Amino acid sequence: MKNRNINNHDNWETPAYIYDELNKEFNFDFDPCPICFDEITPDKDGLLIEWGQRNFVNPPYSRKLKEAFVKKAIEESKKGKLCVCLLPVSTSTILFHDYILPNAYDIRFLRGRVKFIGYNTFGEKVDNKAGMHDSMVVIFK
């Protein structure tokens, strides 16, 4: 399977200051959306495999993948698993009103914009200085 993220700029890393703070609180044991520039095989595809008990989820933000990972997080939470999702704030969407609001245990809106880490056209690691959008942490359990 081709890497579904590499060509549409979905490979942005979570800054350590956000992950570390959340990990202190939740003690994650799995990340279904790690940065991956290689081929995503079925045994590594976060949409196909079983998740851990305490999951950190910063999904690709393209619409279809974001929706798929939110729905998978809800599905996993119904099995008694914790899923902490870092998502763009988009409160007018069907995803927010029909999936996130009715299923979220908690929603935390972050102050300021997150400066995600990615790679420029020269392959150099950079952050997006201004942040692209507001962010929220959505907890499903």
Region spans (language model):
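Class I S-adenosyl-L-methionine-dependent methyltransferase catalytic core
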Residues: 1-141
